[in-house]
Amino acid sequence: NCCNANGPRAFAMIPRVMYRLPSTGRVDVNLFIPSQATIEMGGQSIALSQETEYPLNGNVQITVNPQREASFTIGLRIPAWSQKTAVEVNGQKVEGVRAGQYCLIERTWKAGDKISLTTDIKARLIERNDMQAIERGPVVLARDTRFRDGYIDEACLIPTHDGNIVDLEPIS
């Protein structure tokens, strides 16, 4: 099927979509992956470095290193599933962060500036069309009938608290 044929192409596209220059004077960070990138903008090189264990946790640290101080905008993609997201630049809280939008940080950047992004990665029970799924950040937990480990339509009760939060426990 098309997923088997086209799925591997997505991995090759990661470097092209992780960072993007949508307009003059702006660079977007779309994916949160440990990485280092150099972007040419405004007649200089700007190095961006990401440190993260995402999606194991929701913390991302981005270091910005322009060759010289420069004014430009960094757009952080805020995932739609993150109900509570915090963004800081050099320890100062950024206001107006909204799920499903870009957080635009316009400032004069200097070498060593740090952006901290903390996403709300709690597991949540999602119920739609008489079906259930558990989402934990960008990961959707699903049951696959191909494993033949029971009847897929078998009813189950997934306990939640604080609305739709699910407690998950890792197994080894």
Can you describe what each PLM-predicted range is?
Residues 57-59, 71, 112:
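A general secondary-structure signal for short beta-strands and their flanking turns/coil
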Residues 68, 99, 110-111:
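Surface-exposed loops/turns
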Residues 69-89:
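Beta-strand-rich binding/interaction modules
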Residues 67, 79, 120-122:
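Histidine- and/or cysteine-centered catalytic micro-motif in compact active-site loops
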Residues 82-107, 125-129:
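Solvent-exposed beta-strand/loop surfaces of large extracellular or lumenal domains
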Residues 1-63, 98, 107, 118-172:
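C-terminal beta-rich recognition modules with glycine/proline-rich loops and embedded aromatic residues
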